[in-house]
């Protein structure tokens, strides 16, 4: 079978490197993989399976013979380049927030709304959701199908890798500074992150919510159901990888914890670890490097009719970003919605 020519834009970043790794791990059918970055990173080396790729400049790359661009170069770059890339007949799967709420751009989590990807043709762009939204809707979808969700209250515990490599470096350097009694410098975050939690992710909006909280609300509606009410409190925690969420759900129909556990145990993308004993649950440390959305602490909420509570954890660099993008590419291939371009001899 002829493979796809795939470009990874932002290949030197956390998510870009993970995209390359996952393309190789999952043996996505490629004829060629091209690593792209800014002009200042030309020649930098990144890994693709057992091969080493040298980065080329996004600004001068010709996409006319490329089938898919996995875009993880940031919102400003995506806003400028994704339409140009799409106009050359290359499908962009974008990890930034730039295109998520565009009515002509599908916002896709394959376990939830894979059919939406078929509508990519208007702009040749498909949007990846916010990392915290992706794992949430994977957990909510099978429960929504069973008992119809009315309202969700979610508190997130988001790792620093969601803010990039510089944020991971800051947590490391601050932690070291605390133990060596050196001054603690906060540059990437508004306050110290080491041994602390910060109840702000992204900028504040007029109603007092942060943009991250707003993203979770509007993206869940677009992906899952516009009638679902959702409120979120998003918190940055001193963890390197994996986001955790405490989720409270109110349903229209009755559903027990046992029913929910059975449903989630067989749901695509979910892995239930829920033993009512010390350590019988998942933590972000254990989820790092894994593909699943892990569900624990499933229980009924006696304070609201038809209520459940649960704990949800996933690797934000994988399911929350890179893995989801590659899964979208797999949907396009497996369903025949995208064919490799014919190469001119």
PLM regions with names:
Residues 254-288:
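Terminal hydrophobic/aromatic helix or amphipathic segment near a protein terminus
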Residues 40, 241-244, 289:
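A short, glycine/Asx- and small/polar-enriched loop/turn
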Residues 235-238, 314-319:
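Glycine-rich phosphate/pyrophosphate-binding beta-alpha loops
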Residues 179-184, 215-219, 230-235, 246, ...:
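Glycine-rich, charged/polar anion/phosphate-binding loops
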Residues 194-240:
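Oxyanion-binding "anion nests"
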Residues 232-233, 238-268:
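Internal helical hairpin/lid segments
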Residues 124-135, 208-217, 222, 320-324:
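A glycine-rich, Thr/Ser-enriched phosphate-binding loop motif common to dinucleotide/cofactor-binding enzymes
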Residues 1-193, 229, 257, 262, ...:
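N-terminal Rossmann-like NAD(P) cofactor-binding subdomain of oxidoreductases
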